[in-house]
């Protein structure tokens, strides 16, 4: 089992050390990332980080103790102006050819997971029920501006409340399924390139990363 994290620095600052990454301050961001890494190492021993070269420099300077750092291409340079911040994680998933557990850098796993967890075909943090309709409203907005949703989503979208897999933790033993899932997500992005560039809706990340994972599993 591989234990993975992904961090892609979108920082446009001269010094990416000051990247807040959604936190109140850079200090909170990097401290949380370090604690997340240390907790995974405490439980499972070996943790690999997938990151772009900008992020790698900071991680090495701060001595965050990843056992392996895999430098990924600056894939987001081709998506300037888009809101596809989950795409680097999708890239990490697509590169895996053996069972893995991916944990977000702001997820703190204080306790090791039970043995029964590792027997599952697929892993996710939890199932979320979209009772606030964030995903549905995002999809409705997307369709209204010309976006195309894959056919495999049709049945679930007829339900009053749709379900998504929280990707704070994601992975599994069924790597073949995960490869198929990432292919479908990439195809969605490719087929809707023009719409995604014009429609700056960050909730679309939940659709192609979390909703598709859940839909493809339940429809399989």
Task: Describe the residue ranges of each PLM region.
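N-terminal anchoring/stem segment of glycosyltransferases
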Residues: 1-76
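Short, solvent-exposed loop/turn segments at secondary-structure junctions
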Residues: 9-13, 54-57, 76-77, 107-109, ...
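A conserved donor-nucleotide-binding helix/loop in the catalytic core
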Residues: 28-30, 35-36, 75-103, 107-110
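Short glycine/proline-enriched coil/turn segments at helix->beta-strand junctions
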Residues: 42-46, 65-66, 95-100, 118-120
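Conserved donor-nucleotide/metal-binding helix-loop-beta segment in metal-dependent transferases, i.e.
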Residues: 112-142
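A conserved mid-domain beta-alpha-beta active-site/ligand-binding segment of alpha/beta enzyme cores
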Residues: 149-190
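Short active-site alpha-helical segment characteristic of glycosyltransferases
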Residues: 209-213
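Conserved small/polar residues in nucleotide/adenosyl-binding loops
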Residues: 217-220
């Amino acid at each position: 089992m591989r234990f993975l994290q992904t961090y892609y620095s979108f920082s446009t600052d001269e010094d990416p050390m000051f990247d807040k990454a959604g936190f109140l301050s850079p200090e909170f961001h990097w401290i949380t990332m370090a604690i997340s890494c240390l907790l995974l190492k405490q439980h499972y021993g070996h943790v690999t980080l997938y990151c772009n070269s900008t992020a790698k420099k900071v991680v090495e300077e701060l001595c965050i103790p990843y056992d392996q750092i895999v430098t990924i291409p600056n894939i987001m340079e081709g998506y300037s102006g888009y809101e596809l911040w989950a795409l680097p994680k999708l890239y990490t998933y697509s590169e895996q050819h053996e069972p893995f557990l991916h944990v977000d850098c702001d997820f703190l796993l204080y306790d090791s997971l039970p043995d029964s967890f590792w027997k599952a075909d697929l892993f996710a943090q939890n199932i979320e029920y979209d009772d606030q309709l964030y995903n549905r409203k995002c999809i409705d907005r997307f369709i209204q501006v010309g976006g195309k949703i894959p056919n495999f989503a049709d049945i679930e979208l007829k339900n009053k409340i749709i379900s998504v897999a929280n990707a704070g933790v994601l992975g599994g033993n069924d790597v073949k399924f995960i490869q198929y899932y990432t292919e479908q997500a990439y195809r969605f992005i490719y087929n809707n390139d023009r719409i995604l560039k014009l429609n700056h809706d960050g909730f679309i990340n939940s659709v192609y990363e979390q909703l598709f994972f859940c839909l493809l599993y339940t429809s399989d």
